[in-house]
């Protein structure tokens, strides 16, 4: 019989695939003798079985839960459902990959009306028991029935107003009894039934709810942006309750073995006296820093500090721990590798190597490539900070800087991003429902919550700035306004700027500056470069882009889109004259005017990137994209060409296409108008010769786009070679150049062995290859892809991560066929996928020579390539 339930003592840290991260770590801590409340884990296999069985728990799984519960009763000396000595449990999710705030938790499960009354009488602490009961009802209603927590928070706020108190902790035992009754009434009103009184029914419903939550909207979204497959499922951890809310000698907290914002080696965290764990991360009360525990409970602090160091030594990584103190006794509820900012991730990795705790390769594997994005983006300029007006301060919860219009709901921020509007998400406190809004924002500002609140943890993981706990700001959700300590009012749509490194909130929009990279980052990236096999190039159309990419470690240009050079006003006019020319003579005259611009641009690129190679893609988009749109532009062009406006309208109409993506573009333009390819070749080769004459090594790689037939490539290549060789011969310079093609039409991948006979390199244009393989338009796919994610048809955006099964198969076929006739064939990719870590790893697996990506993604690709090489060599 398959085992679906494991007691903590039966597992270990290597079983995270079936026990989930939390369950595996609870098992490990139990086995090394740490004070962990007893419990058991329902496996990820049980989760997958739940979905296979039509969202029902099988009798097998239920029977194994009963057996484990009986063993837990025996160990604890308490009985589940007993009136005077009840075993209460927490039910928590725990996926294989850490997903903070993504899944759901229920505490104090096992209470009902009779048990609460008898238990309170026995222990003589009515406030504690009914505080626990009302929390249980609220969590059960939220997780199991989908009843919004905010409805219950409103009831609590009404009681606090009636009593004239500010915090939950100031409510007495009678208030807790009243709250419990009000919560039960609210539950019945919403659910249409009384709150369940049978403890085992409560448990089974909670387990099913956690399994269900694996496929809630926010979990699906989080998985998609973090490349977590839905097939992994989540485990459920059922654990004996320990109570941080049993009095002034109890408490709960969250702490890290190092500072998750800076990486500094020092205990960092927060705790609340007389509270339960969810209070700390929910941000409902602002907690005390962990350092004050040293004076409040010195023995507990000493024990905790010792355990924290033991856990870091054991896991060889910074740990994020949850703990509870019950009547002066410390319990560890969880440990996991802590989420951290990008700068902290790099510092911790470098420090652990210097402390001889891990190797350089282990350090490289420790940092998520996507995190580096946060290190590469702008901060506020010193001048703007000096002149900026600070209107409030909160906690520096996630570093970096962000400016934007303030909005108070995640949905508004998401809509603004679609419109290209920079927004800050402002909330009392964030919840898991805000995840997509946070990811769409330039930063997050919360009124409540501490350094380990949901907002802080998730923002750090996403690499966006966050100021939390700005409690001097008054947020009016109905009027959508913020009132600052000085009395100033900011309305929805007004600009604010937040600095997540200092906690300061500024009026208006502050000026930003480029990030500077040095120190630990350079050390860390040098280790990555030692480990990787793939080269990393950049997609750059200007010398400025090329120089930025060089700063980030680019080793050449993998894609220069020549059409982008035509869009400046004086250039576009001459280019339009070329397009609208009706004779070869007119066209060549227009091209002669364009030639100097192109040559000068290429010289700048060659100089910026020397001595590395530069891949220049010849004209690719359909000609109609360059045509004049307004009547003024049309008349101006007609006058210059000596045509009437009507005649020019006819030319424009003749160039219009029904399906331009598959129309007159790419190599088809060079075949129809060979003079375009000649002009571009002259510009490339003459620029290379001019730069070479200055003593700079130049290697141009000329790339013919949209080839689907070897004869197309041969025709254009012959023009290129004839033109280039004539110029080189007359110059007296020994210049080497290469001619290759983009593989972006499925037919090109299928016939790559033929095409390779005429190509010195292949660059896979994964944007168009994905469009043509799926039959999707990248520009229109957003209209329906969300439905695909919601219905489980797609897990990932195929335009962001290579579809390994379809597009990837074509790439593999193209690579193998190409190298079968030309073993020295250079292989690369130049689509948006070149900066996606999973796609980079796929290219490493296929034996590609390089990937090419936008300048700001170069470090991400360098690290992804290093991780891929290390894991491949380890056989993983």
Language-model features: where?
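Conserved alpha/beta-domain cores
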Residues: 92-93, 517-519, 527-876
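Extended, non-globular alpha-helical segments
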Residues: 393-433, 485-523
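Structural motif
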Residues: 237, 407, 424-426, 445, ...
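Nucleotide/phosphate-binding sheet-loop regions of phosphoryl- and nucleotidyl-transfer enzymes
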Residues: 1-388, 411-415, 421-424, 431-436, ...
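Short beta->alpha connector loops at strand-helix junctions that form conserved
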Residues: 40, 447-449, 468-471, 560, ...
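Glycine-rich phosphate/ribose-binding loops and adjacent secondary-structure elements
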Residues: 329-331, 431-439, 443-445, 451-458, ...
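Short mixed-charge
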Residues: 70-82, 482-484, 725-734
């Amino acid at each position: 019989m398959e085992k679906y339930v494991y007691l903590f003592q039966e597992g270990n840290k290597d079983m995270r695939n079936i026990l989930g991260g939390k369950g595996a770590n609870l098992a490990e801590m139990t086995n090394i003798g740490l004070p962990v409340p007893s419990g058991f884990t329902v496996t990820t296999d049980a989760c997958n079985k739940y979905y296979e069985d039509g969202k029902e728990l099988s009798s097998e799984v239920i029977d194994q839960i009963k057996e484990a519960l009986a063993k837990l009763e025996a160990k604890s000396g308490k009985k589940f459902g007993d009136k005077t000595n009840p075993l209460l449990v927490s039910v928590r999710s725990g996926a294989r990959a850490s997903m903070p705030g993504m899944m759901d938790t229920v505490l104090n499960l096992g209470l009902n009306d009779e048990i609460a009354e008898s238990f309170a009488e026995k222990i003589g602490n009515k406030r504690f028991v009914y505080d626990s009961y009302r929390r249980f009802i609220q969590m059960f209603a939220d997780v199991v029935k989908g009843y919004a927590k905010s409805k219950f928070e409103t009831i609590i706020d009404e009681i606090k107003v009636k009593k004239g108190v500010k915090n939950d902790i100031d409510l007495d035992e009678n208030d807790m009894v009243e709250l419990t009754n009000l919560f039960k009434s609210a539950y019945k009103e919403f659910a249409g039934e009384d709150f369940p009184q049978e403890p085992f029914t409560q448990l089974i419903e909670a387990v099913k709810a956690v399994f269900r939550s694996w496929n809630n909207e926010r979990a699906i979204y989080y998985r998609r942006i973090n490349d977590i497959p839905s097939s992994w499922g989540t485990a459920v951890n059922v654990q004996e309750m320990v109570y941080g809310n049993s009095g002034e000698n109890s408490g709960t907290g969250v702490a890290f073995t190092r500072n998750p914002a800076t990486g500094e080696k020092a205990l960092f965290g927060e705790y609340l006296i007389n509270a339960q764990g969810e209070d700390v991360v929910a941000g409902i009360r602002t907690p005390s820093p962990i350092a004050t525990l040293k004076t409040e409970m010195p023995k507990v602090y000493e024990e905790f500090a010792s355990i924290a160091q033991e856990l870091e030594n054991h896991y060889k990584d910074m740990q994020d721990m949850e703990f509870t103190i019950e009547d002066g006794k410390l319990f560890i509820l969880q440990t996991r590798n802590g989420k951290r900012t990008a700068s902290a991730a790099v510092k911790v990795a470098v420090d652990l190597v210097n402390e001889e705790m891990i190797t350089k390769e282990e350090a490289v594997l420790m940092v998520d490539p996507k995190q580096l994005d946060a290190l590469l983006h702008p901060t506020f300029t010193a001048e703007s900070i000096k002149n900026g007006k600070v209107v409030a301060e909160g906690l520096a919860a996630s570093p970096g800087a962000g400016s934007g219009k303030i909005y108070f709901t995640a949905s508004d921020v998401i809509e603004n991003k679609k419109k290209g509007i920079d927004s800050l998400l402002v909330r009392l406190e964030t919840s898991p429902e805000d995840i997509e809004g946070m990811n769409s924002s330039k930063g997050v500002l919360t009124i409540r919550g501490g350094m380990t609140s949901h907002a802080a943890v998730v923002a750090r993981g996403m690499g966006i700035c966050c100021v939390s706990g700005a409690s001097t700001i008054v947020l009016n959700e109905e009027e959508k306004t913020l009132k600052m300590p000085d009395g100033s009012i900011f309305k929805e749509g007004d600009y604010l700027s937040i600095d997540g490194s200092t906690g300061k909130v500024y009026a208006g929009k502050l000026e930003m500056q480029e990030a500077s990279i040095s120190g630990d980052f350079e050390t860390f990236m040098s280790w990555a470069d030692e480990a990787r096999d793939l080269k990393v190039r950049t997609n750059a159309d200007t010398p400025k882009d090329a120089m930025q990419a060089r700063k980030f470690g680019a080793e050449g240009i993998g894609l220069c889109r020549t059409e982008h050079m035509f869009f400046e006003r004086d250039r576009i006019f001459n280019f339009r004259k070329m397009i609208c020319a009706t004779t070869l003579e007119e066209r060549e005259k227009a091209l002669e005017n364009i030639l100097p611009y192109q040559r000068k641009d290429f010289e700048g690129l060659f100089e910026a990137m020397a001595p590395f190679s530069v891949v220049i893609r010849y004209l690719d988009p359909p000609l109609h994209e360059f045509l004049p749109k307004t009547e003024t532009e049309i008349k101006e062009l007609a006058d210059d060409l000596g045509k009437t406006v009507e005649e020019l309208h006819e030319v424009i109409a003749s160039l219009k296409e029904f399906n331009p993506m598959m129309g007159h573009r790419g190599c088809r333009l060079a075949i129809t108008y060979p003079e375009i390819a000649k002009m571009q070749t002259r510009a490339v080769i003459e620029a290379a010769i001019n730069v070479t004459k200055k003593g700079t090594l130049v290697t141009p790689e000329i790339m013919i786009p949209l080839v689907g037939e070897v004869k197309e490539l041969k025709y254009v290549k012959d023009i290129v070679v004839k033109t280039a060789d004539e110029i080189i011969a007359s110059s007296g310079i020994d210049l080497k150049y290469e001619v290759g093609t983009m593989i972006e039409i499925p037919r090109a991948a299928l016939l790559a062995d033929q095409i390779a006979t005429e190509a010195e390199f292949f660059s896979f244009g994964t944007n168009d290859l994905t469009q043509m393989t799926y039959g999707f338009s990248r520009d229109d796919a957003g209209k329906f892809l969300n439905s695909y994610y919601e219905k489980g048809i797609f897990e990932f955006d195929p335009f962001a991560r290579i579809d390994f099964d379809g597009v990837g198969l074509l790439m593999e076929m193209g690579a193998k066929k190409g190298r079968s006739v030309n073993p020295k064939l250079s292989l690369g990719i130049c689509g948006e996928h070149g900066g996606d870590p999973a796609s980079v790893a796929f290219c490493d697996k296929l034996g590609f020579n390089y990937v090419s990506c936008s300048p700001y993604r170069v470090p991400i690709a360098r690290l992804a390539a290093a991780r891929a090489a290390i894991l491949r060599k380890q056989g993983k």
